[in-house]
Amino acid sequence: LEEMGILGPNLLTAHNVMLSDHDIALMAERGVKMIHCPRANLANHGFPKAPQILEAGASLGLGCDGAAPSNIFDEMKVLRYAMMAYWGLPSFNPVVMTCPTLLKMASQGGANALGHGDILGSVEEGKKADLILLNIDQPHITPSQNLVNTIVDAANGHDVTDSIINGKIVMKNREVLTLDEERIRFEAEKHMNDIIKRAY
């Protein structure tokens, strides 16, 4: 890819589990955007060198590889515990992948990967208001001594109550305001039945 002139800030690579230290340094130097898909990686590909990639100064975000059952909360947990087991235990380093680092990968890292880190990925003046609200008044979240750690370790997609995209509320109190969920489920079921009939 380097010889072809492809490595650069407009390249987004997924998984990144087979990279050598030289590859990591080169990709970081060229500004390549990288995404890890932890569940898919562990199921099929292997352990990514996430700590080394971050140490090299590369942009690293989280994805779910298109897997519908997954969500960003699951991906953060899987990567955290995989990194602790694979990279942390041998060196007796239980914080090889910290919760603030994972939250940044899930937010700013994803925005950077899309090439929109200047307008998305963090709550700052001048950036688009893309936010989710969590119900933290629940026994698996509260009380919390460190909310960032608790969100990464304990929160899940069911805790999301509201979603705001570019300042517009699209989900309020777990009700999607912009789509007909019942109709979508009905259509999905109908199409699935048609696919099954054709397959057998």
Spans of model-derived segments:
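Short, charged, surface-exposed secondary-structure boundary motifs
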Residues: 43-48, 71-74, 143
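Short, acidic/turn-prone active-site loops that include or flank metal/cofactor-
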Residues: 38-43, 65-68
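His/Asp/Glu-enriched, well-ordered alpha-helical/loop segment
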Residues: 4-6, 10, 51-138, 154-155
